[in-house]
């Protein structure tokens, strides 16, 4: 019997889910798939300035899981930057924190704090 899925908590979806080179033949480029929880780990650690422990707490996962998710995301970003590939963000095992969730539970990201 497989283990039940543990949903990762994500504050908000990216405003755009496709990133890559702006060349005329960009559609011919290889696409790297990044999950929403990988995007969230990068957002929390690199943009919000959290450490892995704080990121893990926000995402409702173990620190080792947050570290693995973050490292996977960094490898994908580096591959896309160095090799001119496209990153597409979609899928994963996540649940969005809702706007109705109390702020003490969500903590609120910059987007929610700024009302965007």
Curated annotation (Swiss-Prot):
Please give the SUPFAM superfamilies that the UniProt record associates with this protein.
Sigma3 and sigma4 domains of RNA polymerase sigma factors (SSF88659)
Give disulfide pairs as residue numbers. none
Q: What Pfam families does this protein's entry cite?
A: DUF134
Q: Which InterPro entries match?
A: RNA_pol_sigma_r3/r4-like, UPF0251, WH-like_DNA-bd_sf
Q: Which Gene3D superfamilies match?
A: Winged helix-like DNA-binding domain superfamily/Winged helix DNA-binding domain
Q: Where are the transmembrane segments?
A: none
Question: What HAMAP family does the entry give?
Answer: UPF0251
Family stated for the protein in its record = Belongs to the UPF0251 family.
Which named protein is this?
A: UPF0251 protein Amet_1463
Q: Which organism is it from?
A: Alkaliphilus metalliredigens (strain QYMF)
